[in-house]
Amino acid sequence: MAAIKPDPNRVKEFLEQFTFDSLRMVGTLEREETNWILVKDPEGGVHRVKVGNFLGRNHGKIVDMGDTFVAVVEIVSDGTKDGWVERPRTIKLSGL
């Protein structure tokens, strides 16, 4: 099993500049047989993301979604020099 660690060579996505807690799920959308999640950033912009996209500042990868939630797994430091752990998080659907 590979060690858990963020990929330093991966190009960051737009929503990774915001803290996880500042992002809000505001809806879902199905277009061309793809299910999308609508996420609102703290500046008021609404973004279309799907499973596999990243958001938040802790390498948060979207791993699942439903009509009322987005499941994310972040990679965060475990407090040691080179140690990392996975931390599951959820964003629930909120009102506009």
Where are these predicted regions, by residue range?
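Extended low-complexity, proline-rich intrinsically disordered regions
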Residues: 1-96
